[in-house]
């Protein structure tokens, strides 16, 4: 299992990765592992190729590449959410769910 570190740079500092692209790849994989390959939005489990990393607070709106701002999402949910507010989008798409608490716990 890949260790879950705060951001890609920590993989370089801890000599787990030798290049920044390797560090980012390891960081993304560790996030998917942390969420058990399950989309935080729809709650379905996928194989690695169908998952992506979503910025809860989109980078286009000032969100950072930090552990507290990224979650595991299926490509469909990630694309559908786009740069919308995650909570507004999630409630419109799925209603109020227990998964909200999972996300809130992770980002706070």
Region spans (language model):
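General secondary-structure edge motif
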Residues: 11-12, 19-22, 36-37, 54, ...
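General structural signal for alpha-helix termini and helix-helix connectors
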Residues: 17, 58-59, 76
